């Protein structure tokens, strides 16, 4: 069964060119990044650790990202235990 996930991603890259030019073509297309994430999440995963690692590797490589920080939260995983969510956070 598919479960809801909350994913926070921070991309670290050189934004000087777009900061100076104010040209959207000189920066990361965040819409394209989101589409890539949605596509990657169509695969079945057993763990949120594997989700985080897969997203980190693929996004970093495809979009020429220097560093990436990803937090994957599973909101309903531990409700019966009184926790808001289970989570994993990685930085690559």
Named regions from a protein language model:
Residues 1-92:
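N-terminal, polar/charged subdomain of small-to-medium soluble alpha/beta proteins
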């Amino acid at each position: 069964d598919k479960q809801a996930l909350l994913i926070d991603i921070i991309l670290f890259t050189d934004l000087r060119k777009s900061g100076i030019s104010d040209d959207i073509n000189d920066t990361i297309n965040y819409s394209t990044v989101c589409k890539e994430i949605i596509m990657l999440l169509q695969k079945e995963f057993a763990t949120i650790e594997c989700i985080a690692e897969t997203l980190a590797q693929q996004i970093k490589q495809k979009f020429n990202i220097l560093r990436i920080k990803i937090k994957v939260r599973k909101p309903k995983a531990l409700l019966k235990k009184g926790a808001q969510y289970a989570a994993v956070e990685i930085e690559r």
